[in-house]
Amino acid sequence: MKLFILAVGHKMPGWIASGFDEYTKRMPPELRIELREIKPELRSGGRSADSVMAAERQKIEAALPKGARIVALDERGRDWTTMQLAQALPGWQQDGRDVAFVIGGADGLDPELKARADVLLRISSMTLPHGMVRVLLAEQLYRAWSITQNHPYHRA
């Protein structure tokens, strides 16, 4: 199983890439994280948010690994604790499907993509910069894995 993070956005600051890389390099070979950046659509020429999200959805769908479990990050998603994420990981590994975490663009994710998702997950009740979400998600995936391995990284 492989973990994918599909994120609408590009040209993140160096500190975002550095933070993201720090956690992805800690992951074991059987749980590698791959980032797939999706170029955001321009909101020029009077385009509506709906048309932008629909165009971004098409790009996201083209980048999704075939048969992957989709975890869409959304402000109206379910709140999971780190322990709940840690409990989900082994089951996901056992079923063998790749897992794709999807971070939308500035306008969010298209409703069709959210409806198709296996899980709608809220990473925070606060509004966060999309680059920061990449780092937080990578850290939480590493922490969840460390919990499943009784690794000392997580001390609770």
UniProtKB/Swiss-Prot annotation:
The lineage of its organism: Bacteria, Pseudomonadati, Pseudomonadota, Betaproteobacteria, Burkholderiales. S-adenosyl-L-methionine binds at L73, G104, I123, S124, S125, M126, T127, L128. Gene3D superfamilies: 3.40.1280.10. Keywords: Cytoplasm, Methyltransferase, rRNA processing, S-adenosyl-L-methionine, Transferase. GO terms for molecular function: rRNA (pseudouridine-N3-)-methyltransferase activity. It comes from the Bacteria. It is an enzyme of class 2 (transferase). One of its GO terms (cellular component) is cytoplasm. Its EC number is 2.1.1.177. This is Ribosomal RNA large subunit methyltransferase H. Belongs to the RNA methyltransferase RlmH family. Specifically methylates the pseudouridine at position 1915 (m3Psi1915) in 23S rRNA. It catalyses: pseudouridine(1915) in 23S rRNA + S-adenosyl-L-methionine = N(3)-methylpseudouridine(1915) in 23S rRNA + S-adenosyl-L-homocysteine + H(+). The gene is rlmH. Homodimer. PANTHER family: METHYLTRANSFERASE, RIBOSOMAL RNA LARGE SUBUNIT METHYLTRANSFERASE H. It is found in: Cytoplasm.
